[in-house]
């Protein structure tokens, strides 16, 4: 699609900047580390989430390793196992049921793995939805067959509404991954912010990770937390975008939410990051107001703190370079 006044077309220059409709987008100001330090400090100041200590769970690690071994390609999946374990022992450490934590971990391994084009292309992902409807894929061995069994188990661990939502979120993620792997998404219309938000929501499986916060054993009544789900979803997306920024800049990645939002809104990268911080802080306050005091609020607060630690305690995001500290798990 050729660029006109109605389209935003992005391509890389030799200097690593981006061209938007014939104009150079505003580059990141100053060094990446300095910017990230400032952004992360501002994020912590505005969101006001505590920083509790989290520990490894050897039993969970052993159980997950045994299951992943049956999927094949264990070595290639190892980095995704590390990230998924860290997510569970931090953001979902408040969940008492061991089997629920196992399923969250396995779900996450497959979601992250399918985000890898090498893994995605090795699976029959493009026919996933149709084969799910016909019941064929449920009997297959390997990762996609395992994924269907994980999804089937969600009704054992979450209320009907939440389990339905988790299932639908997973299907939306696979659909979005197909689009990202088959379509040139570097060309955006100049007023495409709603599409950028829509795509980000699908690829982040935000509905699933929001619903994971409130398991059925403690929260059988969805009405207790349902109105908080949209802002919890926003938190899932934006915290990841803010705290993944350093990793993505190191890798030279520009096909991501921060850059795409900056392009379609005409803002600089630092301004875009600060807007996300403000929107995240507002979302946290709304969740707190909606949930009030009690167990549902406590579950969210644990998730909010743990989800930050997912990024600061994980070598995947390289944030030790920026803010110091130690990683929870370097490898398994």
UniProtKB/Swiss-Prot annotation:
EC number(s) recorded for this UniProt protein: 4.2.3.-
Keyword flag Magnesium: yes
Locus of motif NSE/DTE motif: 240-248
UniProt keywords, alphabetically: Lyase, Magnesium, Metal-binding
Disulfide bonds: none
InterPro entries: Isoprenoid_synthase_dom_sf, Trichodiene_synth
Cofactor dependency: Mg(2+)
Molecular function as annotated in GO: carbon-oxygen lyase activity, acting on phosphates; metal ion binding
Protein name: Monoterpene synthase 25
Annotated source species: Postia placenta (strain ATCC 44394 / Madison 698-R) (Brown rot fungus)
Name of encoding gene: STS-25
């Amino acid at each position: 699609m050729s660029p006109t006044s109605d389209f935003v077309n992005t391509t890389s220059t030799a200097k690593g900047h981006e061209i938007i409709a014939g104009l150079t987008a505003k580059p990141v100001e100053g060094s990446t580390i300095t910017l990230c330090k400032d952004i992360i400090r501002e994020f912590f100041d505005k969101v006001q989430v505590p920083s509790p200590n989290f520990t490894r769970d050897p039993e969970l690690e052993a159980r997950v390793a045994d299951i992943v071994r049956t999927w094949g390609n264990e070595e290639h999946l190892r980095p995704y196992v590390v990230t998924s374990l860290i997510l569970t022992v931090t953001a979902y450490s408040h969940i008492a049921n061991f089997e629920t934590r196992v399923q969250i971990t396995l779900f996450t391994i497959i979601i992250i793995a399918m985000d890898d084009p090498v893994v995605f292309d090795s699976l029959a992902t493009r026919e996933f939805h149709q084969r799910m409807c016909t019941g064929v894929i449920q009997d297959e061995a390997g990762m996609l067959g395992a994924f269907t069994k994980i999804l089937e188990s969600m009704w054992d661990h979450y209320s009907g509404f939440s389990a339905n939502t988790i299932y639908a979120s997973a299907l939306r993620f696979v659909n979005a991954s197909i689009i990202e792997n088959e379509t040139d998404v570097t060309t955006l219309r100049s007023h495409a912010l709603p599409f950028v938000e829509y795509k980000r929501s699908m690829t982040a499986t935000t509905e699933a990770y929001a619903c994971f916060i409130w398991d059925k054993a403690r929260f059988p009544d969805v009405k207790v937390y349902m109105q908080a789900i949209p802002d919890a979803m926003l938190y899932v997306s934006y915290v990841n975008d803010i705290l993944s920024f350093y990793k993505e800049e190191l890798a030279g990645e520009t096909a991501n939410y921060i850059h795409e939002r900056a392009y379609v809104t005409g803002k600089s990268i630092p301004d875009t990051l600060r807007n996300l911080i403000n929107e995240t802080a507002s979302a946290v306050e709304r969740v707190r107001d909606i949930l009030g005091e009690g167990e549902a609020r406590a579950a969210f607060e644990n998730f909010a703190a743990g989800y930050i630690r997912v990024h600061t305690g994980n070598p995947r995001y390289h944030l030790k370079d920026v803010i110091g500290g130690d990683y929870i798990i370097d490898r398994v």
